[in-house]
Amino acid sequence: MYDILPPELWIKIVDYSGEINLLLTSINFFELFNLVDVKVNVIEYIIENELIDVLKHIVVLKNLKHPIMGKNIISIESLNKCLLDSCNKGQLKIVQHLINIGANIESNNNYAVLLASGGGHLEVVKYLVSQGANIKSKNNRVVGWASQHGRLEVVKYLVSLGADIRSNDDYAVRWASEHGHLEVAKYLVSLGADIRSKYYYILCGASQNGYLEIIKYIVSLGADIRAYNNCAVKWASQCGHIDIVKYLASQGADIRNDNDYCVGLASKNGHIEVVKYLVSQGADIKTYNDHAVKVASKK
């Protein structure tokens, strides 16, 4: 097809249409990138359309130090952006080719390995590590991110490389618990993670988000359910998690703490079943000058 018309005409056709599809159909057409005036981001277009063979060809050209690679048709900014997107999606082959072309795995504080870890893409994580990615950057944020997203196998791998699960005030177990990832939380605790970190924020976060099994597990370890001024039952009441409110109350949480603040929060947010339960347990809806009644009447 390339030989049907002289290169000059192909260049005019591409410049007029603004489309680069044609240039990606053969080696001869690809050479015309030196001569055309297109506004399309080449590497992003290639990645979005998963044109693996084109990526392979670019790797070959780079290794050969072909003149076309010096024409800025592919910027380092585009490479790095596409690398992050591919790591997030777990596209190992694309990640490998992008790095071979020149994408920087350490850009944005090793954000590539963080995204791959959060996405649970273990093979991508392993490859990035083999290429020098730093799993301990930003105070071991990578293992915390994997924990937050419930990626147990990734967490185990990172730990095997020396990731510090206790950094950042036990960030890993706090976020695993707050997001309901029980198996990750158990694993981290087995390695020494402290459930009491940050005034039992684990318990409060799990209560706020409605993760009863996490709460039961933490309580089984001896957590103080009244910690941080009974924040757990307050947040559960505020968010309408009736089963958690009942469980915490059964374990000794003070539902009347702060002048019946729980019933006020439940009323404010329209959680009638929680309000009924709290009242049945002795909560006074008239506390704070009928605050609960006034707030509920405004909804």
From Swiss-Prot:
Q: Where are the ANK repeats?
A: 78-107, 108-137, 139-167, 168-197, 199-227, 228-257, 258-287
Q: List the disulfide bonds.
A: none
Q: Does the keyword Nucleotide-binding apply?
A: no
**Domain of life from the UniProt record:** Viruses
- InterPro entries, A to Z: Ankyrin_rpt, Ankyrin_rpt-contain_sf
Which UniProt key words apply to this protein? ANK repeat, Repeat
**Protein name as annotated:** Putative ankyrin repeat protein R864
The top of its lineage is: Viruses, Varidnaviria, Bamfordvirae, Nucleocytoviricota, Megaviricetes
